[in-house]
Amino acid sequence: MTDVPVSRLRNFCIIAHIDHGKSTLADRLLQDTGTVAGRDMQEQFLDNMDLERERGITIKLQAARMNYTAADGESYVLNLIDTPGHVDFSYEVSRSLQACEGALLVVDASQGVEAQTLANVYLALENDLEIIPVLNKIDLPGSDPERIKEEIEAIIGLDTSTAIACSAKTGLGVPEIMQAVVDRIPPPADTIDKPTKALIFDSYYDSYRGVIVYFRVISGRISTKDKVLLMASKKSYELDEIGVMSPDQCEVNELHAGEVGYLAASIKAVADARVGDTITLLNAPADEPLPGYTEAKPMVFCGLFPTDSDQYPDLREALDKLQLSDAALKYEPETSSAMGFGFRCGFLGLLHMEIVQERLEREYDLDLIVTAPSVIYKVNMIDGQMLMVDNPATLPDPQRRESIEEPYVRMEIYAPNEYNGTLMGLCQERRGEYIDMKYITTERVTLIYELPLAEVVTDFFDQMKSRTKGYASMEYHLIGYRRNDLVRLDVLINAEKADPLTTIAHRDKAYSIGKGLVEKLKELIPRQQFKIPLQASIGSRIIASESISAMRKDVLAKCYGGDISRKKKLLKKQAKGKKRMKAMGKVDVPQEAFMAVLKLNQTS
């Protein structure tokens, strides 16, 4: 099955913004090449997780090998590597691009170029990939292929005279795409005689065989009897099996340079076979690994607590298992007086956080409370030390710290130009600095802003979508840290600090956030038998307060008339009981209260 000469191999991926029809096109290619029989076909074939199908997004990378007979009568092997399209998973995209020689750039013929497409195109150009523009959804009444071609030329600078118009849904134009892959994407370099190197572009955990690693052989060859060495983790393994995905796994004896396949070697955790790592042979290792390997760094942090403290061991086990298949997830134990035991987790971004939370609740049947997300702050101490703080509750006291720096991102927003004003207003509200504005076409504009990551991770995306009726798209990347006048905003419920509600805010916005927060808590926390004071404070200064009045039982109901001193005695007894209750009582804070912290930026 693998005796195909290198000249007849093609490795390519599909680049597209969310919802532009990437998974549908992948389905169509699998069907047209007979890789998947019609009866086995289901929509979004390569999106294996239920969550992926429901949200209509690709999270984990998939790969498929297709046999195709071209117009010249030769049979070719096409390896399609599916990529995620969301900004959180851009590292996964960059690695899958490294495993390819070409890419199909799929653009919705009615919507045009979106931010995420652009980010991935730049990654593809950095990797010197041959890019074939494809205009999808041309069967829709609103499609305007000529305008979109102009847009692609204006924004990306690609020649669109050979762009292929298609409809992945009806199959129109798909044969032309297949032929273009063969004609225009170069074959892999013929490096079978060089030392063996293979790039890991994905891995997932299989409970029976351990970690299954997807890789692309860059040079040399790998066969079943080899012992392999992973160069970044310095671990060696004996291979149990190697094979190709077509799209179900199919065992083979050997893979050579240019081919894409999988291997199983009883690897215990995904962290041992990191994406981007280089596989080489143990007895004849390569001199140096392939370039570009970096460990995925979490950008967004939040606390995860089980609603029932008995579930804490289950949560630990679930996170351990998730980490086996998601090496970007980081976590450590955390305790809080208000919430009990839980974990502080780090994620690539907000979508990644939501997906992990949803997978924990779905696949492991856990009830979770999630605290507001925060970012990593750099704190410069008076004694010259520098601390990295990812949990607002652990921020040192003002007397000990000299300054706080927060991460900034450079953001590009693509939108129709009638939404210019509202988008600029949104960026201004979020402490954004205006950098530039470019007109791509007469109707579409690019806004470039630099803003604090903390302002982006809450609900910036939702706000942007709702203000532009869903037409805007954005892309951002980290540009470094900047010093700002930041303060720690504590929330006290019944004179007790609620750590999970602590946030770090800019001094100018602290008052409105604090006021909004206590007002929101007043609505959300149920009334108790005693009065609950709610306060927002910066250090020892209370900047906003509200109180939830007590529920009152009428103790005088049974005194019809009677002596006033009797009534006073009963009221005094009630007041005494309430005082004791207040000293002893614990206030349960509902999950909505923690999420309220997130939503406050809308109003502040």
Swiss-Prot record:
GTP binds at residues 19-24, 136-139. Pfam families: EFG_C (PF00679), GTP_EFTU (PF00009), GTP_EFTU_D2 (PF03144), LepA_C (PF06421). Its main location: membrane. It is found in: Cell inner membrane. GO terms for molecular function: GTP binding; GTPase activity; ribosome binding. It comes from Prochlorococcus marinus (strain MIT 9313). Its EC number is 3.6.5.n1. CDD domains: EF4_II, EF4_III, LepA, lepA_C. GO terms for biological process: positive regulation of translation; translation. This is Elongation factor 4. The gene is lepA. Required for accurate and efficient protein synthesis under certain stress conditions. May act as a fidelity factor of the translation reaction, by catalyzing a one-codon backward translocation of tRNAs on improperly translocated ribosomes. Back-translocation proceeds from a post-translocation (POST) complex to a pre-translocation (PRE) complex, thus giving elongation factor G a second chance to translocate the tRNAs correctly. Binds to ribosomes in a GTP-dependent manner. It is a peripheral membrane protein. Keywords: Cell inner membrane, Cell membrane, GTP-binding, Hydrolase, Membrane, Nucleotide-binding, Protein biosynthesis. Residues 7-189 form the tr-type G domain. Belongs to the TRAFAC class translation factor GTPase superfamily. Classic translation factor GTPase family. LepA subfamily.
